[in-house]
A protein has these predicted regions:
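Short polybasic amphipathic segments
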Residues: 36-44, 105-114
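A short, sequence-level motif marking secondary-structure junctions
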Residues: 57-63, 97-102, 125-131
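Beta-strand elements of well-folded, non-transmembrane domains
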Residues: 7-9, 21, 48, 84-88, ...
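Boundary/junction segments of secreted and surface-exposed precursor proteins
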Residues: 1-18
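A short, surface-exposed beta-strand/turn
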Residues: 91-110
Length: 134
């Protein structure tokens, strides 16, 4: 799965981080259904914080019944966990990304980061696109 975008920014929802809140976080991703497949990248930025995935520990792809087409991919959801660095400190991440078609406004994101920083964000993309690929 590839893509990126920002969420949530215009709905009044906030993300929580290190005891504070703000509207919006951005992410870019290239993730495989098999954690051993390379490369796997996840970058998340919000406020003055930055998380970078170093190792994808687990990944599972599934189909929640909503069509990600085009193109057909056989799945539309990836969820998993990994380790990385947040603000140069060790951190862990769990995530779930769903491709619900074009242009991406129905795509959903859920990201939880702990360790070097904390972030909890979930919702529909407000800009960008998540794309499932074979």
């Amino acid at each position: 799965m590839t893509g990126g975008g920002n969420e949530p920014t215009t709905t009044g929802q906030t993300v929580t981080f290190n005891g504070g809140t703000q509207q919006g976080a951005t992410q870019g991703l290239l993730l495989h259904c098999n954690a051993a497949s390379q490369p796997n990248n996840l970058q998340v930025n919000w406020a003055n914080n930055s998380f970078h995935l170093q190792q994808l520990v687990s990944a599972t792809c599934s189909n929640d019944g909503m069509s990600p087409q085009p193109p057909p991919a056989g799945f539309d959801v990836i969820q998993g966990s990994g380790t990385g660095r947040c603000n140069k400190l060790a951190a862990t991440v769990t995530f779930k990304f769903a491709d619900h078609g074009e242009p991406g406004t129905n795509d959903t994101v859920e990201i939880h980061i702990t360790g070097g920083c904390t972030l909890d964000v979930s919702g529909n993309l407000q800009g960008g696109d998540i794309q499932a690929h074979n």
